[in-house]
Amino acid sequence: FTGIIKTVNHQDRIKIETKRMGDQTKGTITTLWYSLNERNQQQFEINGPSTVRIYSRILFDSNQLMENYYIFVREDGIDLGTYYFQTEKSTESLVLDSKETVSKWRSLWLNIPDGKHYYNFSLANLAENQGNSVFIRLKEWTEE
């Protein structure tokens, strides 16, 4: 992969800590994620041609084991799609500051056409998404 993509307006990121239970050589890994909720969306400027992988996780309530969520994606102001994810609670990852549990990550791939493009990510306006907090991070990939 070639790099992490940051938002257009350089918003603060949430730290998520992952403890590698089965791999003692890696120890604890801290990654930075952008927050999506009912009031908060994220916009990214991406230059193509490129391939981008969008990782996502949902914040879990303590009594949940499984959760579903939807992410709505727009490319240059045009609806690209609503993506559905089903996930389970992570036993290794949590939000660093609050110690709240998050899900295992899920992902989708976007093929970015030639030129400069703007991508908006938000939670889909569905009853099932009410009250959800989702975290995303984008990685750009290039062919070798």
Question: Where on the chain are the PLM-derived regions?
Answer:
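Beta-strand-rich ligand-recognition modules
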Residues: 1-3, 75-140
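Extracellular Ig-like/FN3 beta-sandwich strand-entry sites
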Residues: 49, 66, 114-118
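N-terminal hydrophobic or amphipathic segments with adjacent small-residue motifs
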Residues: 31-34, 71, 109
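Residue-level marker for the onset of beta-strands and adjacent loop->beta junctions
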Residues: 40-42, 69, 106-108
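Short coil-to-beta strand junction motifs in C2/discoidin
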Residues: 63-72
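Glycan-recognition and processing domains
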Residues: 1-49, 57-62, 84, 89-100, ...
